[in-house]
From Swiss-Prot:
The lineage of its organism: Eukaryota, Metazoa, Chordata, Craniata, Vertebrata. One of its GO terms (biological process) is protein localization to plasma membrane. It comes from Mus musculus (Mouse). The modification Phosphoserine is found at S360, S363, S420, S692. SUPFAM superfamilies: ARM repeat (SSF48371). Component of a complex required to localize phosphatidylinositol 4-kinase (PI4K) to the plasma membrane. The complex acts as a regulator of phosphatidylinositol 4-phosphate (PtdIns(4)P) synthesis. In the complex, EFR3A probably acts as the membrane-anchoring component. Also involved in responsiveness to G-protein-coupled receptors; it is however unclear whether this role is direct or indirect. The gene is Efr3a. InterPro entries: ARM-type_fold (IPR016024), EFR3-like_ARM (IPR049152), EFR3_Homologs (IPR051851). This is Protein EFR3 homolog A. Widely expressed. Expressed in neurons of the superior olivary complex of the auditory brainstem. Also expressed at lower levels in the cochlear nucleus, the lateral leminiscal nuclei and the inferior collicus. Pfam families: EFR3_ARM (PF21052).
Length: 819
């Protein structure tokens, strides 16, 4: 009887419930009843309006089975749901989807790993279904939170933990695919969701044992690796997420990366950080690259007070990002990037200078901090170099001017970098760092004319005396000049100072000097000669300085030299030889021999370049004589570790020196204008010499004049019986000495105007005129305006003359006039 009652009751139940009940076997181990499942599917397709009821009833049964821990029936219910979901594609499926998502949520909330994985797999299948019309009211907040939590699973069993994490990553991937394609439903890009999704993916990517350090875009992993390795699957999902990011939501996807790296202290060491940003730069669209760079710069500003290693790690990440971004779109904020980098460079130098001034207390710690700051500085310079070298020429010239404007130059206020707290040591350090940055930016820069590469606004501060106070500064200045002068890649052939037997073997590339280059040398040639001349006479020069000076002379000869410039360069070389022999600057014997070797190497080079046989013969003869009698005058010997130096140079034979008269005779026979060779080269005096802290060349010239004047014998014979008193000595010094000095000055001026080239005289007159103009302007600024007059002041308004009187009670009288 009870059985009949049940049969009667079941017959009264709705058909969809009977069909649903029939798919469940008595023993869950038998699995889904396929025949009844086909009937249920056919019924759902035939009557789509019943889908919501079928889904609700399945959800009811599944919830009951989950509570009662009937895992077998749960598996059957989810399998049936999946089949119905895949078979039905209509508008009526939307209510069914709500029931489906409710059942998936029930499985994810359960504490059993198998059910969580089962729910995730069903959600992934659902995510791959393309709906005809998306449902905008549907939200996935719960699934984002739950899948993110599964990505951080800490299950005691490693296999189960890995399985749960893989399920969480696949779930996040499903959410992304389901929502990210719909532009009208952008909730997934909101910060509260990205703050969960991105760290969850990075947490699993962090488990990669060996971080990929390839420069190119990494190859896509295989399907087997994705299914078995959480790190590989997380990286694939991260790439997919970034690849779908647009202009408006790019920052929301990148900022959680910084938070994760900060929280887990992954900037030092920064291998994982570099790996992450390589993935970001290669995954996003090229036109959005500059957004990522701006975010890195902003984070660098925010962490400016952190340890040097953390800042260095961020800058190295920026370097990798810039190296990738520079190949595509860089964006309009190039100067902002360089400005931020230079600001952090100054900050690093300032911190280094402050640490070095703390004294010997904690010297080990201070030394360690200094080394860390050097890491920061090198990272900044490399980043500037990579960024600058990939810019187009028009932008690179702007960056060159921008960096040069930051270089502190003594006596001028043109630089825009705050160095008030750096001190002398810090200022020198920032000069070196900026010049190193400039060197990297100018590397590979090719300008059609030298005027474009070295404009006056760039050349003047570059050749400033302030950048000659240290041998390293001078090296960097010369290297920057070489980058800009060497337009035919000849510098590598000239590397190393040596006597070249046959210059033709070097296969020097050169072109005919254009009119713009000739004009440049007429205007700035004396400035270049002066820099080389003074650079050779510095006491702290090392071998590299002489090599770079030799290369400078050779490059000027190749790129900029016509007949007049060749004569000027030979004059300069002879003047250097004379300065080494006379030794007015009290240089050491090594430096004097180094100058002699430099002159020999250059005259050997220029004689073969202009191919005048008599000149080549004279140079070769002097070099042969030096090889036999004075090898320390040749670069191959003087720059060796152990070289015997002479005690003096005054007693040497004239055959060891290059003689002006023989050079003039040889060049004159070939049509060169050699009148200027007989005029000794004297570097022009500039205004910067008067402002510089270094010993001015004016002082050197005045000392020479004093020595000469004192050595000239007096024509007047003083009587032995003359009374010698203090007043007499004072009078003799005031009259006789001054007269001799005036005579000598007049003689030098007359000789200069008779023999010196017009360009040199014009340059000196121009510098004096500029100095006079500046002094006059200062005097006019200090001039006090006269007091107002009661009669008024004359003003012109709209073409009419008017007087504006000043009331007496408003006038200010001197105190002595008031009683």
């Amino acid at each position: 009887m009870p059985t009949r009652v049940c049969c009667c009751c079941s017959a009264l139940r709705p058909r969809y419930k009977r069909l649903v009940d029939n798919i469940f076997p008595e023993d869950p181990k038998d699995g889904l009843v396929k025949a009844d499942m086909e009937k249920l599917t056919f019924y759902a397709v035939s009557a789509p309006e019943k889908l919501d009821r079928i889904g609700a009833y399945l959800a009811e049964r599944l919830s009951r089975d989950v509570v009662r821990h009937r895992s077998g029936y749960v598996l059957i219910a989810m399998e049936a749901l999946d089949q119905l979901l895949m078979a039905c594609h209509s508008q009526s499926i939307k209510p069914f989807v709500e029931s489906f998502l409710h059942m998936v949520a029930k499985l994810l909330e359960s504490g059993e790993p198998k059910l969580q994985v089962l729910g995730t797999n069903s959600f992934v299948k659902f995510a791959n279904i393309e709906e005809d019309t998306p449902s905008y009211h549907r939200r996935y907040d719960f699934f984002v939170s739950r899948f993110s939590a599964m990505c951080h699973s800490c299950h005691s069993d490693p296999e189960i933990r890995t399985e749960i994490r893989i399920a969480g990553i696949r779930g996040i991937q499903g959410v992304v695919r389901k929502t990210v394609n719909d532009e009208l439903r952008a909730t997934i890009w909101e910060p509260q969701h990205m703050d969960k999704i991105v760290p969850s993916l990075l947490f699993n990517m962090q488990k990669i044992e060996e971080v990929d350090s390839r420069l190119g875009p990494p190859s896509s992993p295989s399907a087997a690796d994705k299914e078995e390795n959480p790190a590989v699957l997380a990286e694939s999902c991260f790439r997919e997420l970034l690849g779908r990011a647009t202009f408006g939501n790019m920052n929301n996807a990148v900022r959680p990366v910084f938070a994760h790296l900060d929280h887990h202290k992954l900037w030092d060491p920064n291998e994982f950080a570099v790996h992450c940003f390589k993935i970001i730069m290669y995954s996003i669209q090229a036109q959005y690259s500059h957004h990522v760079i701006q975010e890195i710069l902003g984070h660098l500003d925010a962490r400016r007070k952190d340890s040097p290693r953390v800042r260095a790690g961020i800058i190295q990440v920026l370097l990798e990002a810039v190296a990738i971004a520079a190949k595509g779109s860089i964006g309009p904020t190039v100067l902002e990037v360089f400005n931020t980098l230079l600001k952090h460079l100054r900050l690093s130098v300032e911190l280094e200078a402050n640490d070095s001034q703390k004294g010997s207390v904690g010297s080990v710690t201070v030394s360690s901090k200094d080394n860390d700051e050097k890491i920061v500085q090198n990272a900044v310079i490399q980043t500037i170099g990579f960024f600058g070298s990939n810019l187009p020429d028009y932008q690179r010239s702007e960056i060159m001017m921008f960096i040069m404007g930051k270089v502190p130059v003594f006596g001028t206020s043109t630089h825009t970098l705050d160095i008030s707290q750096l001190g002398d040591l810090g200022t020198r350090r920032i000069q070196i760092m900026l010049l190193r940055s400039l060197l990297m930016v100018t590397s590979g820069y090719k300008a059609k004319t030298i005027v474009t590469a070295l404009p006056g606004s760039f050349l003047d501060p570059l050749l400033s005396p302030s950048l000659m106070e240290d041998y390293e500064l001078r090296q960097l200045v010369l290297e920057v000049m070489h980058n800009l002068m060497d337009r035919h890649d000849n510098r590598a052939k000239l590397r190393g100072i040596r006597i070249i037997p046959d210059v033709a073997d070097l296969k020097i590339k050169r072109e005919k000097i254009c009119r713009q280059d000739t004009s440049f040398m007429k205007k700035n040639g004396q400035q270049l000669y002066r820099h080389i001349y003074l650079g050779c006479k510095e006491e702290d020069n090392v071998q590299k300085n002489y090599e770079l000076l030799y290369t400078s002379l050779a490059l000027i000869t190749i790129e900029l030299a016509n007949e007049e410039v060749v004569i000027d360069l030979i004059r300069l070389a002879i003047a250097l030889q004379d300065s080494a022999i006379i030794n007015e600057d009290n240089l050491s014997m090594f430096h004097r021999c180094g100058i002699m070797a430099l002159v020999a190497a250059y005259l050997n080079f220029v004689s073969q370049m202009i191919a005048v046989p008599a000149f080549c013969q004279h140079v070769s003869k002097v070099i042969e004589t030096r090889t036999m009698e004075a090898p320390y005058f040749l670069p191959e010997h003087i720059f060796r570790d152990k070289c015997m130096l002479p005690k003096s140079l005054e007693k040497h034979d004239k055959n060891l020196y290059f003689l002006t008269n023989k050079i003039a005779e040889s060049l004159g026979g070939s049509g060169y204008s050699v009148e200027r060779l007989t005029v000794p080269y004297v570097p022009q005096v500039t205004d910067e010499d008067r402002l510089s802290r270094r010993k001015s060349i004016v002082d050197t010239v005045s000392i020479q004049v004093d020595i000469l004047s004192n050595s000239v014998p007096s024509d007047d014979v003083v009587s032995n019986t003359e009374e010698i008193t203090f007043e007499a000595l004072k009078k003799a010094i005031d009259t006789n000495g001054m007269e001799e000095q005036e005579k000598e000055k007049r003689r030098l001026v007359i000789e200069k105007f008779q023999k010196a080239p017009f360009e040199e005289i014009a340059a000196q007159c121009e510098s004096k005129a500029n100095l006079l103009h500046d002094r006059l302007a200062q005097i006019l600024e200090l001039t006090i305006r006269p007091p107002p007059s009661p009669s008024g002041t004359l003003t012109v308004t709209s073409g009419h003359t008017q007087y504006q009187s000043v009331p007496v009670y408003e006038m200010k009288f001197p105190d002595l006039c008031v009683y």
